[in-house]
Amino acid sequence: MTSDLEQKWNQRYAEADPAAATPCAVLEQFAHLLPPDGAALDVACGLGGNASLLAGRGLVTRAWDRSPVGIAKLREHAEEHGLPIRAEVRDVEREPPDPGAFDVIVVSYFLERALAPALATALRPGGLLFYQTWTREAVDDRGPGNPDFRLAPNELLELFPDLRLLAYREEGLFGDPAEGLRNEAWLVGARPPA
């Protein structure tokens, strides 16, 4: 049986074009940190904007989402463009990644706090986590209405205490709310080398 959440995302993706899917800003801005090869995972991938960037940079990429519609469209897009993406319908909350399985993990606009330890341990030594999601401090109504799906100030840092911090950005409500990064937090962290 299809859940309400799955139905919501299936409807959204049914009308969408995967060619228009773009990578999240934190991944684009810090793509220079990516390794030249290795295994990557795009969590809650949607139409695969992050997965496409990762695969295009030479990483063997897996993309997981609970929407069969989104995954079908991503598979078709990857095949048409010769991208090494293995797109799978998978509920990452029930089936988290295996420990030490990935060199890169990207999460954008998805928040399941209980999954944070599994994401950190799924990184290989020296592996990178790129994370971008909504914050409770917001200047407009973009993002989810439920505060459970938004981060408290500095919470993203607290969710990944064992990673080496390479980049972090969260501007909250400081300064001119019409400028800068608003409504979101970004993190790039690395699992320490063995």
PLM-predicted stretches and their roles:
Residues M1-P35, D37-G46:
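Conserved class I S-adenosyl-L-methionine
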Residues L111-T121:
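A short, conserved alpha-helix within the catalytic core of class I
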Residues G127-W134:
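Conserved beta-strand signature within the Rossmann-like core of class I S-adenosyl-L-methionine
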Residues E95-V104:
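A short acidic, Gly/Pro-enriched loop at the edge of an enzyme's catalytic core
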Residues S67-V69:
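Conserved SAM/SAH-binding beta-strand->alpha-helix loop
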Residues L47-L59:
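Conserved SAM-binding loop of SAM-dependent methyltransferases across substrates and taxa
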Residues H81-V92:
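Conserved SAM-binding strand-loop segment of SAM-dependent methyltransferases
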